[in-house]
């Protein structure tokens, strides 16, 4: 038998004017499992990220974006991955209770792994993404995001990031966030899995 202890924290901030939209988000997740028979503990998850995006609407629905993401995952032996990018987006629907947008652009990726070789990579990628959220019962938000990032120099190398969840308010700023997070890396560090799927329940702070 094992005893697991996990912590999941996140924040999400967004501001919208007539022609600009700014969003910033971050997340931290750690999990430790303890073998009750041997009393030995080992870390099964330890990762975090910060990301931000600025959108400039040159029409009511069309926008250009600048974004950046920095992430680290000790279990995946990822020391860091930094991804600044630019692109074009289209806001198909924007309402108080329903939003849907798509994006396409270019991203520069620089990463370093903590394996024996200390592998370092930098390359250009494309980026395709969509964002969907729908609010029910006036306050409970359902959301789904998907991001596909193929290496332009090697078609066999790509990343997929996706999540789907439910966010329910506890206070005016604090929400309970229950979600599935999926990440796929076609070229991970040695002896590491390509797929990482997590089922998280945690707290999110809304600005």
Regions from the PLM with identified roles:
Residues 17-19, 28-32, 70-74, 90-92, ...:
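Transmembrane beta-strands of outer-membrane beta-barrel pores
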Residues 1-2, 36-43, 73-79, 91-95, ...:
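Outer-membrane beta-barrel domain signature
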Residues 14-18, 55-57, 71, 89-93, ...:
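Structural signature of outer-membrane beta-barrel channels/translocons
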Residues 3-7, 44-48, 80-84, 98, ...:
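Residues that define the transmembrane beta-barrel architecture of outer-membrane proteins
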Residues 85, 169, 195-207:
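Outer-membrane beta-barrel "beta-signal"
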Residues 18-24, 61-64, 96-100, 134-142, ...:
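Repeated loop/turn-to-beta-strand initiation elements of outer-membrane beta-barrel proteins
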Residues 24-26, 52, 66-68, 84-86, ...:
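Membrane-embedded beta-strand positions of outer-membrane beta-barrel proteins
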Residues 1-51, 67-73:
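Transmembrane beta-barrel domains of bacterial outer-membrane proteins
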